[in-house]
Amino acid sequence: MDCVNISWFLITLFAAIATSTMHDGENNNVGKMLQEPTYLQSEMIESIMSRHLESFSLTESDFEDIIFMKPRSKCVKDALKDIIPECMRLGVDSIEPGLQKKAAIQLSICEFENSKVTYPSSCYNMINDNDFDSCIFDIERAPQYWTTFSGYYREITKICYEESLPFEKEQIISLYSNITKLYSKMFQDLNDSYKDSTHIQQMMKNEFKELQRMMKVILDQNEKTSEEVKEKYEEFSEQYSSMLSTSLEISKKFSLGTENLVEDMANNIKYLDFELSRISIAIEDLDFETKLTDMKNSVLDDVRNLSDESISLLDSILTNLESLDILSQDAQNITNGISQSLKKNEVLSNNMNNALIETDTQLHEHNEVIRFEFEETISYLSQFSDQAIDNAIRDTSEEITKHVATFIDSINLRLEETTTKLEEVIYNIDDLSDKVGNASSYLIEGLNLLTSNGIMDALLLTYNNVASGLESGFGMLTTLKSDIFKIVRFITACILFAILFIWSMNRLFSQNRTKHTTLSSISPIGILNFRRIFRFLTNLALWLSVMGGTLLAVIVTNFLIQLKVYISKLSTND
């Protein structure tokens, strides 16, 4: 009964410890679940285990002493081992004569051996019934042997009564001895499992601390990189906003200057028309038709040359515009890539947070599984069955091993996924940096294209050729050349710069006007406004043609005025 009480006490103790530990684990987070027991708790648990191990050792020694306190010899036990169970099972009256005869012969031989009396050789090594019959036949010949045999044969029933209780006691002692040894082994295994679980718990705690530290470092680096990219993008947007504002101001100033120039040219055309009408009336009687025809042909040749050079210049401008369109598309693609990279970084951050939450959930489930398995183990132990206890211990070990392996595999999988996602974040950050660098290079290339000297040199060459042709044909534009050249060069440069810059900015920001708050208040030019600008440029080209014709008219008028003065001088001299 002491063994039973000790066993129940141990089971109750372990159930209380397991329930308390699991209850504390449910009320704490992942970090507290992995927290090792305090020093006082460890000392208390070790003290309890050592005390009960000593109790088991003392109980085992007591059982050994009880087993060694045998009232009879081994020979007597062997002689009665077959008849006592039958006597207890069926009763004294149901003992078979053959079994009773065998027991009486064996008891007689035990007495002969204890008394060191020689007995017949046929009674040695008896195996089957014939051997026993031969032994009885030889014993019957000697009266002293037969007296001993017959006495034991008659006393079998009495011996059965006397030996039933000691036999039952031995069976009970053997049973409880086996149970005590089993519980001792189970307790030792539980003690070893507790030590192993403490070691594993400490290892898992260290690994989770290292994982937490690594995740914190990675998140800090990611946040720092995101801030740097955000600052660079804001600076880039501010520069674009400033350039766009400057281009809008230049466009407004150019529009006002163009309107004033058109008004002045209209007034000059009206004045020239009036003067030409007067001059045409004055020279009707003069014979200058041949000279005027030559002058007209020369002027037409110069105009054709100017037209050819203008066409080639327009082709060059269209080529540059196509290049600028390609650069604008590349800048647009880079901007889209930057936006997609930022979205990917956000998705990866959300996935990392979800992975941490799933890890927390799996730890909680792992704790629940351990508690459930421990409760199942306790329920099996309460049945006092050797087979049930062995099966429970084996199943519990397999389940715990399986769940621990599954949990470790899950952690390794989460670590691999986290590593892959971190590599993707680093790759996206590098790609983002390359795209920002490409965007800066494209911007610089576009600005260099806008300020390229090739277009300006072509315009200067065209107007120099026109001016030199007019000057060589008439010799009357020395004073007018420099002023007209400066005005036309300034107007042309402003027009080309405004057209190229506004067109490129429209292509770059037409689909990304809501990407940043700095640009949210600036509306793109749009297709309709671009058509208006193109229509304006067409009218401007027509106006330039009119201006060329007007310039030609001014030259002709100047020539006619000088001719009139010359004729007047000749008339005065005559």
From Swiss-Prot:
Signal peptide limits: 1-20
Record keyword Transferase present = no
Q: For this UniProt entry, which segments traverse the membrane?
A: 484-504, 541-561
User: Where is it chiefly localized?
Assistant: endoplasmic reticulum
Q: Note the InterPro entries from the entry.
A: Nuclear_fusion_Kar5
Task: Tell me one Pfam family matched here.
Answer: Tht1
Glycosylation (residues): N178, N191, N305, N333, N438
Name a single GO biological process.
nuclear membrane fusion involved in karyogamy
rRNA processing as a keyword of this entry, yes or no, is no
Family per similarity comment: Belongs to the KAR5 family.
The role this protein plays is: Required for nuclear membrane fusion during karyogamy.
Q: What is this protein called?
A: Nuclear fusion protein KAR5
